[in-house]
A protein has these predicted regions:
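N-terminal Rossmann-like NAD(P)+-binding subdomain of aldehyde/semialdehyde dehydrogenases
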Residues: 1-128
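Conserved small-residue-rich beta-alpha loop and adjacent elements
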Residues: 123-162
Length: 162
């Protein structure tokens, strides 16, 4: 059984303001496969505050730096691919073939597609007498469904980082 009881906020693992635990249940076996801590408004506020602080420097990153970041994420994803398949299988109660083909593979594909789009994207271009500059707008919040975890997370996170 896995217990992931801390949150990753501001570059470190921190305890929640809550002591409430939520069981993670494999819907195919109804076995409790782990626990996570129930987050609180205070936990969200800490995460948003850290994200806003980080954004002040992240918004200054170059296209090349963001390309490198996405390449690093792809490399780490590929290194942990089999782990993702196993975790998705347990969390969703899905057959391994489905976790691999429809979940883990879709996640890495999403990041690759975002990387390809980023490489070709024009953040600055002349428009008549002026120059149009597209820049990051700020911190985002994401809610993802349980039934497409890697697809939704990778789509949203990779686009936000690009």
């Amino acid at each position: 059984m896995s217990n992931d009881l801390n949150f990753y906020i501001n570059g470190e693992w921190v305890k929640s303001e809550s002591n409430e635990l939520i069981d993670v249940i494999n819907p195919a076996t109804e076995e409790v496969i782990g626990q996570v801590t129930a987050g609180t408004k205070e936990d969200i506020d800490k995460a948003v505050s850290a994200a806003l602080e980080a954004f002040s420097t992240f918004q200054q990153t170059t296209k090349e730096q963001r390309i490198e970041l996405l390449n690093n994420i792809i490399s780490e994803y590929e290194n942990r691919y089999d782990d993702f398949v196993q975790i998705i299988t347990k969390e969703m109660g899905a057959p391994i073939w489905l976790s691999e083909a429809a979940q883990a593979k879709t996640g890495i594909k999403n990041i690759h597609e975002t990387l390809d789009a980023l490489k070709d994207y024009e953040f600055e271009r002349p428009e008549g007498d002026y120059t149009l500059i597209k820049e990051p707008i700020g911190v985002i919040g994401m809610i993802t469904p349980w039934n497409w975890p890697m697809n939704q997370i990778t789509t949203k996170v990779s686009a936000a980082l690009a």
